[in-house]
Regions:
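Short, surface-exposed linear patches
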Residues: 40-42, 54-58, 78-82
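Short intrinsically disordered coil segments
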Residues: 47-52, 72-75
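Compact nucleic-acid interaction/catalytic patches
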Residues: 66
């Protein structure tokens, strides 16, 4: 089931701190970032039926993958890709970017 962007954002905000594209330097871990990646048109013989936007959703954390469980439960009814992880170093701390991609119905539909 696809959800609207407003529903996506409301659910994400229930999980903790959420930022679009970049977090402020003062943000405390863990936090979520969502970033627009692309738009698709779902078409039929009568024209465009639905416009769907894709977002990358990232959890930046000093913790472990178990921190993904609340997201998985909150979005259980919405298809999203398997999470991937990229370790990194930030201010001499090991930080992990756990990310997925999710599609939502574009605003105004």
């Amino acid at each position: 089931m696809l959800i609207t962007f407003d529903e996506f954002l409301a659910r994400l905000k229930q999980l903790g701190a959420v930022y679009r594209d970049v977090a402020p330097r003062t943000a405390k871990y863990p936090y979520w970032i969502y970033t627009y990646t692309n738009t698709q048109r779902l078409v039929a013989s009568t024209g465009t039926r639905l416009i769907v936007n894709e977002y990358q959703v990232s959890l930046f954390t000093k913790g472990v993958e178990d921190e993904l469980l609340p997201f998985i439960k909150k979005f259980d009814d919405v298809p999203f890709e398997s999470f991937r992880g990229i370790p990194g170093d930030e201010n001499d701390e090991t930080i992990t970017d756990l990310y997925t991609y999710i599609e939502v119905i574009a605003g105004g539909q």
